[in-house]
Amino acid sequence: MDEVKYPVLTEKSIRLLERNQYTFNVDSQLNKTKMKIWIEHFFDVKVIAMNSYRLPEKGGKGGSMIGHPIRCKRMIITLKPGDSIPLFSEQ
């Protein structure tokens, strides 16, 4: 799926892994419903909650560019206890 760019590994996202929450950067046009269906189908897990937010915009450097470039969206996905995404397993 091209809309899911990559998993995020920051201090906050690593801390959230302990609470069974996974963080992904996704395309700015992707909505929660499509993401939930994709995660449940691809990883065979049960999603119980999703939070999303847009990353802060970066200012332009002048020139012919007007406004700000569209950046990606970040989604935090909470899974049912006992489920996990294999990308982050320690095996």
Swiss-Prot record:
GO terms for cellular component: chloroplast; ribonucleoprotein complex; ribosome. One of its GO terms (molecular function) is rRNA binding. One of its GO terms (biological process) is translation. It comes from Picea abies. Part of the 50S ribosomal subunit. Keywords: Chloroplast, Plastid, Ribonucleoprotein, Ribosomal protein, RNA-binding, rRNA-binding. Belongs to the universal ribosomal protein uL23 family. This is Large ribosomal subunit protein uL23c. The gene is rpl23. The keyword Plastid applies. Its main location: plastid. Binds to 23S rRNA. It comes from the Eukaryota. InterPro entries: Nucleotide-bd_a/b_plait_sf (IPR012677), Ribosomal_uL23-like (IPR013025), Ribosomal_uL23/eL15/eS24_sf (IPR012678), Ribosomal_uL23_CS (IPR001014). The keyword Ribosomal protein applies. PANTHER family: 60S RIBOSOMAL PROTEIN L23A (PTHR11620). It is found in: Plastid, Chloroplast.
